[in-house]
Regions:
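FMN-binding flavodoxin-like domain, especially the glycine-rich phosphate-binding loop
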Residues: 2-3, 8-33, 37-138
Length: 138
């Protein structure tokens, strides 16, 4: 089983999470609604990029949970960065005991104008493929 948890301020990461959830036949859960770490096997965790870091709600979720031995795949969107939020999440999760098994990053709309239309159809298709590949590892 796979659980998808995301944080999205502008809707870009939510769009990606929903595409992956649809592909896998599971629900995507906003981190603000995640009271605790799901007991399911693989976790797909995603966030937008805010100052080269994941959003504060996601950073707190990672800090407040024990990921010991859990397989985690990461995804993210950013308008101006190059996936730095994914790297920051990977480092934090490894420190919390997670096994990071993969990551996917896509452009997202930033500052209202930059990257309008992202994640686009091709990026969402790639995200779906990524989700299938990560689910098959578990």
């Amino acid at each position: 089983m796979v659980s998808i948890i995301y944080y999205s301020m502008t809707g870009n990461t939510k769009k990606m999470a929903m595409a992956m959830a649809e592909e896998l036949g599971v629900k995507a859960l906003n981190v603000k609604d995640a009271a605790s770490l799901p007991n399911d096997g693989i976790l797909l965790i995603g966030s937008g990029c805010y100052g080269d870091k994941p959003g504060e709600p996601m950073a707190k979720f990672i800090a407040n949970n024990d990921f010991g031995g859990r397989k985690v795949a990461l995804f993210g969107t950013s308008g101006a960065g190059a996936g730095n939020e994914v790297a920051a999440m990977a480092e934090a999760l490894k420190q919390k005991g997670a096994e990071v098994i993969g990551n996917y990053h896509s452009a997202g709309r930033a500052f209202v104008v930059a990257n309008i239309g992202h994640p686009n159809k091709d990026e969402l298709s790639a995200a779906r493929k990524f989700a299938r590949e990560m689910a098959s590892i578990g």
